[in-house]
Regions:
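Conserved AMP-binding/adenylate-forming core of the ANL superfamily
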Residues: 34-89, 106-111, 163, 203-204
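Conserved pre-ATP/AMP-binding loop-to-beta segment of ANL
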Residues: 31-33, 150, 164-188, 195, ...
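Conserved ATP-binding/catalytic segment of the ANL
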Residues: 400-467, 484
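Conserved AMP-binding/adenylation subdomain of ANL enzymes
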Residues: 207-226, 233-332, 345, 370
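AMP-dependent adenylate-forming
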Residues: 21-47, 561-568
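ANL superfamily adenylate-forming
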Residues: 41, 128-180, 287-337
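Conserved AMP-binding A3 loop
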Residues: 46-50, 184-210
Length: 602
């Protein structure tokens, strides 16, 4: 199958925007809880739609009073917490455009986003974040930024007080300012080269996709459903699901620190969660290690095999009686305990950001947690395709959501069209033009469609590394910084589907003798000996540390290995134009790479 298009389930009027989702929920007699926050006692307290609307409007009035104009850009730099969504919707109620910033970003990264977007203000979480923003503003002498409001300080109170004089009519006019075709947010994404590009996502992208997404996933997103958000809201995946929950009247709680995730799952008891494959890997590995430590390793492995076999049989449409009996037994011995660790009520999980793999998909389905894997990019407001409870094929990323279309180009590239696709790249009509072919967005990924319209991802056209936690990393930025030192010949950053970033480094055989002499080391030291010498290792570590200052913590190189033989054209690791053949390096040095990840503490 070359292409598939799925018609919309929900038609949305053109003069609608994201604020209408909140207003609609607040007008319902049921007044559903849209968010839950931890009170002083540690108990979860619901925030109803009417209460959320009131809080959002109070902050929006403050933004208007502070001089934020329709269409102005306002940044948000914070961990995943209630105030993130409060600020996001307040920006929309004021007719402005929100610009997410990862809270781990360096001042240089923040400076680029603030200056490129022309942000007039920024919401930040803490004094630490405020310092980064102020350093960024000073770094590039950014004059547009007039305000910084801190969640942990009195930023929101300042806005509420400032907004007392803003009348209802002004707010109402601002709220109605944007239609479906207007920009709601600019999300900066890691390009293959150069600076991050700002993806312009419209109110239509969010509203049409969330309305149709909720209609396609009624078992998951509905009034009374509860989820706990722990992925960064700066990432389009978590952000979109947050808006989808408002559209569906589901309740969202937040865990800013993943260390608290397990206790929070147990106290909040979500009905569905949103995660990246790394989370499912951790749940599986922790359960296995716990079983092995308790002398029950055999039970775990047997139970895992039964879960996978049961899921495969269930998907094929027939479960043999013997397997049913074994499955029921392990449900009591093992599966129930894993579900209880996740709060006991989780029935569905939505997975994206990186491939899950069908083994984990079948394992979780087999223990009673249906993992719905989807696929998308920042440029497609997250999901182009997703598996749904009614239409699921484990090992694929599902069929297109209603309103979306997928085509496979002649070279295998996945092309996308529909309500999910961005307007373009901010200030970059040249890049926008390159990103589309005949009206179809070029994803840069390679895949195939089966006869039922389910998409499978088979490879990446681009070189961007996606870690197991879904973080996009541009290898060239780090590699170039490390290669800048004469002692280094080549550097290959590793980390695709891995828990962290590492690097393979080779030494420059011509530069080595001079370096040895300067450091009073024996001239006869071979490259292989130098690769293990403490002085050389210390020098490379210093280079790595310096390179790491240009990126966020999640993108930083945690471990490196010096490889004794250089990567050259003769060894088959360089092209004639001296470009690294990554796949060949990873293949030839797979044992080194495996040793990095098997010995390192995650």
């Amino acid at each position: 199958v070359r292409d598939i298009s799925v018609p919309v389930l929900v038609d949305v009027p053109r003069q609608t925007n994201t604020t209408d989702l909140v207003v609609r929920q607040a007008a319902k007699p049921s007044n559903p809880a849209l968010f839950a926050v931890k009170g002083a006692s540690g108990d979860w307290e619901n925030i109803s739609a009417t209460e959320f609307r009131r809080q959002v409007e109070d902050v929006a009035k403050g933004l208007i009073a502070s001089g934020v104009q329709p269409g102005d850009r306002v940044a948000i730099m914070a961990r995943t917490r209630y105030e993130w969504s409060l600020a996001d919707f307040a920006i929309w109620f004021a007719g402005a455009v929100s610009v997410p910033v990862y809270e781990t970003s360096s001042p240089a990264q923040v400076a680029w986003i603030l200056s490129d977007s022309g942000a007039v203000g920024a919401f930040v979480e803490s004094a630490r974040h405020e310092n980064v923003v102020r350093e960024a503003v000073a770094l590039e002498d950014i004059e547009s930024v007039q305000h910084v409001w801190q969640f942990d300080g009195d930023g929101l109170d300042t806005l509420r007080t400032a907004g007392v004089g803003t009348d209802e009519q002004t707010l109402s006019d601002r709220r109605a300012y944007a239609g479906l075709d207007d920009i709601a947010t600019i999300i900066y994404t890691s390009g293959t080269t150069g600076k991050p590009k700002g993806c312009e996502l419209t109110h239509g992208n969010f509203v049409e996709l969330s309305e149709n997404g909720a209609a396609a996933l009624p078992e998951v997103a509905h009034e009374g459903a509860q989820t706990i958000m722990f992925l960064p809201l700066a990432h389009v995946f978590a952000r979109f699901i947050s808006v989808l929950c408002v559209a569906a009247g589901a309740t969202v709680a937040h865990t800013p620190d993943v260390k608290n995730l397990l206790p929070d799952l147990q106290s909040y008891k979500p009905t569905f969660i949103l995660a990246v494959p790394r989370v499912f890997e951790k749940v599986y590995n922790n359960s296995m290690l716990k079983a092995e430590d308790g002398g029950k390793g055999k039970i775990f492995h047997a139970g895992a095999d039964v879960a996978i076999a049961w899921s495969k049989a269930e998907q094929a449409g027939k479960i043999p009686l013997g397997l049913k009996v074994k499955h029921a037994l392990f449900d009591r011995l093992l599966y129930g305990k894993i579900r209880t660790a996740m709060g006991g009520r989780v029935q569905h999980a939505v997975s994206g950001g990186a491939p899950l793999g069908d083994r984990l998909g079948h394992f979780f389905h087999g223990i009673g947690l249906m993992v719905l894997e989807g696929y998308g990019l920042t440029e497609t407001t997250a999901p182009i395709t997703v598996n749904t409870p009614k239409r699921i094929k484990i090992g694929t990323v599902g069929a297109p959501l209603p309103g979306n279309a997928v085509r496979i180009a002649d070279d295998g590239e996945i092309l996308a069209k529909g309500v999910c696709v961005m307007k373009g790249y901010f200030n970059r009509p040249d890049l926008t033009e390159e990103a589309f072919v005949d009206g179809w967005f070029r994803t840069g990924d390679i895949g195939e469609l089966d006869e039922d319209g389910f998409l499978s991802i088979t490879g990446r056209k681009k070189e961007i590394i996606v870690t197991a936690s879904g973080k996009n990393v541009i290898p060239a930025l780090l590699e170039d910084a490390i290669r800048a030192n004469a002692l280094v010949s080549q550097c290959v950053v590793v980390g695709d589907q891995r828990p962290f970033i590492s690097a393979l480094v080779t030494l420059d055989e011509e530069a080595l003798p001079g370096w040895l002499e300067r450091h009073h080391l024996p001239a006869a030291t071979t490259t292989a000996e130098a690769a293990e010498h403490p002085a050389v290792l210390a020098e490379i570590q210093e280079l790595v540390d310096t390179a790491n200052t240009t990126v966020s913590r999640a993108e930083a190189i945690k471990v490196f290995r010096i490889v004794p033989t250089d990567f050259t054209e003769a060894t088959g690791h360089l092209t004639p134009s001296m470009k690294i053949k990554r796949a060949q390096v990873l293949k030839d040095y797979s044992d080194v790479v495996e040793s990095i990840y098997s010995t390192a503490k995650v």
